């Protein structure tokens, strides 16, 4: 994608999307996802879009956690919770998709409005609350998709109606339903929008959760030709460096395959030039203001683990340069979400093209 194409999205397409639903960000999200779901039903249309947008080059290929990825640029969880548009994401040049976060029980999420744009900072605030159709529904949809066009990771979280003391059983139910269809499974213990969820990052609670899931993983893997699935833990950017080190110790003790760093932040530090009423909205902040903290966390994890633990870097990646910086910081793969909102569907191609011109981040 050259500069003129980027400008066309920014000044031609984006203003139209931002006006949908009288400016309601979630309405624009829903309508865009509906269009992508329709595109996903047509193999010919997906093939045509893929021909125009996807860069296929062996130098982009990665094998991470034993999974072959056609390129390192993925779609972050939250964009397509119920996995309705996976073929379209593949056609747009993503190397993998993480669907979810999905919960055992279907749930509507928090009351609307719950998604807010901060265009001055190229950011979003969301308090969606894991709105999704449930693990069983996602499992049925993924079963129909097999074989998937690109690796599909599945992010699982706790149902809102499930008490924290029963969280392990809730995660296990989702895990067992989705195991057959997931390239990897991400354990989301870091969303700020489900009451009490972040407590599961505490060492003792995380240890118990991972032990239970790895028990199921080993059991299910014995009868599956692909064996156990890689388990990744998604952490919050708001953890202290000491807390991150404790999480890494627990993850190492329980055979976690990688870390996803990071989720959205509850901090509003450095958020300037925006409507104070928007900045005060409850929820997780994503986008441009998160990049510095996300890079710090990725560098910290890479240093503490001696670059031996795979990291999926996510948070504030809006440009090819952001993607390169994340890979240079130690990420094995990267994910985008808010950058897609502000810079358009050809962002994966721009990042992959940049990777090909920078030998430091080629495999």
UniProtKB/Swiss-Prot annotation:
GO BP term (any one): 'de novo' pyrimidine nucleobase biosynthetic process
Protein's organism: Chloroflexus aurantiacus (strain ATCC 29366 / DSM 635 / J-10-fl)
Function: Catalyzes the conversion of dihydroorotate to orotate with quinone as electron acceptor.
Disulfide bonds: none
GO CC annotation terms, alphabetical: cytoplasm; plasma membrane
Membrane topology category: Peripheral membrane protein
Gene coding for it: pyrD
Subcellular location: Cell membrane
Family under the similarity heading: Belongs to the dihydroorotate dehydrogenase family. Type 2 subfamily.
InterPro entries registered for this protein in UniProt: Aldolase_TIM (IPR013785), DHO_dehydrogenase (IPR050074), Dihydroorotate_DH_2 (IPR005719), Dihydroorotate_DH_cat (IPR005720), Dihydroorotate_DH_CS (IPR001295)
Official protein name in the record: Dihydroorotate dehydrogenase (quinone)
Cofactor, free-text remark: Binds 1 FMN per subunit.
GO molecular function, one term: dihydroorotate dehydrogenase (quinone) activity
Binding site for FMN: 77-81, 101, 155, 188, 234, 262, 287, 316, 337-338
Record text on subunit structure and interactions: Monomer.
Reactions catalysed according to its record: (S)-dihydroorotate + a quinone = orotate + a quinol
Pfam families according to UniProt: DHO_dh
Pathway: Pyrimidine metabolism; UMP biosynthesis via de novo pathway; orotate from (S)-dihydroorotate (quinone route): step 1/1
Transmembrane is among the record's keywords: no
């Amino acid at each position: 994608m050259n500069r003129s194409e980027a400008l066309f999205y920014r000044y031609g397409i984006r203003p139209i999307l931002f006006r949908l639903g009288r400016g309601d960000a979630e309405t624009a999200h829903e309508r865009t996802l509906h269009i992508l779901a329709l595109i996903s039903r047509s193999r010919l249309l997906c093939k045509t879009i893929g021909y125009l947008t996807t860069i296929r080059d062996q130098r982009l290929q990665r094998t991470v956690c034993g999974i072959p990825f056609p390129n390192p640029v993925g779609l972050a969880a939250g964009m397509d919770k119920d996995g309705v548009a996976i073929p379209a994401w593949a056609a747009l040049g993503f190397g993998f998709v993480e669907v979810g976060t999905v919960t055992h029980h279907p749930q509507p999420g928090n009351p609307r409005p719950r998604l807010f744009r901060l265009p001055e900072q190229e950011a979003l605030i969301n308090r969606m609350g894991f709105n999704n159709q449930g693990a069983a529904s996602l499992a049925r949809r993924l079963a129909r998709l097999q074989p998937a066009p690109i690796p599909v990771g599945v992010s699982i979280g706790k149902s809102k109606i499930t008490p924290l003391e029963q969280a392990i059983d809730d995660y296990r139910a989702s895990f067992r339903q989705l195991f057959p269809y997931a390239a990897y499974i991400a354990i989301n213990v870091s969303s700020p929008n489900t009451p009490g969820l972040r407590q599961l990052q505490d060492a003792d609670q995380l240890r118990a959760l991972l032990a239970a899931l790895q028990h199921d993983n080993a059991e299910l893997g014995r009868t599956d030709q692909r064996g156990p699935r890689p388990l990744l833990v998604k952490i919050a950017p708001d953890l202290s460096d000491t807390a991150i080190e404790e999480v890494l110790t627990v993850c190492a003790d329980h055979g976690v395959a990688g870390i996803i760093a990071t989720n959205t932040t509850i901090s509003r530090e450095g958020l300037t030039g925006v409507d104070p009423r928007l900045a005060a909205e409850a929820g997780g902040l994503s986008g441009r203001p998160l990049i510095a903290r996300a890079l710090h966390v990725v560098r910290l994890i890479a240093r503490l683990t001696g670059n031996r633990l795979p990291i999926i870097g996510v948070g504030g990646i809006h440009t090819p340069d952001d993607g390169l910086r994340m890979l240079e910081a130690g990420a094995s793969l990267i994910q985008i979400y808010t950058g897609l909102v502000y810079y358009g569907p050809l962002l994966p191609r721009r990042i992959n093209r940049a990777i090909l011109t920078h030998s430091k981040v080629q495999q």
